[in-house]
Amino acid sequence: MAMTLSTKAFAQRGVSARKNTVRVYAATTKVNPKLASKTEVERFKQATGLPAPAINGKQFPLKLGFTKTNELFVGRLAMVGFSASLIGEILTGKGALAQFGYETGLNGIEVDGLVIGLIAFNLIAAVLPTSQTFVPEEQDTISERPAGPLQDPRITLLEPKKFFGVQGFGFTKENELFVGRAAQLGFAFSLIGEAVTGKGALAQFDIETGLSLRDTEFGLVVFILFLLFAAINEGSGKFVDEESA
């Protein structure tokens, strides 16, 4: 009888110990996500010697990869760069490549490799909107996204919102992705046109339309201001890698 009681007591102690282990493991699991985000900030500081970039007091360590957040950043750079090149062409009469050569003292032949790489990167980033799925964190959201022309060939320009992946006018991040992709394509093709013709984006536009810069000045100013505002406006909405922030 004493043996039986001691056996039961030992078994109860074992069960209690296992429960405590499970509780400790569960508590550790719940704490891990907070530690992970802190570790990312610390790793960024350790690798670069600089604090992680902060927006509204919240730190965002830079991550390499074709994510929507990075694509948004590249799109903003394209909008700012395209706008600046147009302003420079108005002031100097030279296109983006000629301005680059003037600033650096290099001629077009010496920067051919750089220009080709820049054009290729702009084209790839603009025409491969699904490339952000290379990041594992965004794989789970693919099924929740509405189909686009790459997934459903029945979607045509007759349905512009579905075709371009926008939901209407407004400074949302989804719409800004579209504007950024358009800026990347426009910048890339303007560089290709300048390499072929020797003329900047505005001069190419004049050749295509037969209109002088004086005739298109107002529309051009509105276009440049829109690109600049779209590039610096934070907009609304968030991406999958911001949901845990």
Curated annotation (Swiss-Prot):
Induction: Induced transiently by high light stress (at protein level). GO terms for biological process: nonphotochemical quenching; photosynthesis. GO terms for cellular component: chloroplast thylakoid membrane; photosystem II. Residues 1-25 form a transit peptide. The chain crosses the membrane at residues 72-92, 108-128, 185-205, 217-237. Belongs to the ELIP/psbS family. Required for non-photochemical quenching (NPQ), a mechanism that converts and dissipates the harmful excess absorbed light energy into heat and protect the photosynthetic apparatus from photo-oxidative damage. Seems involved in the activation of NPQ, possibly by promoting conformational changes required for activation of LHCSR3-dependent quenching in the antenna of photosystem II (PSII). This is Photosystem II protein PSBS2. It comes from Chlamydomonas reinhardtii (Chlamydomonas smithii). The gene is PSBS2.
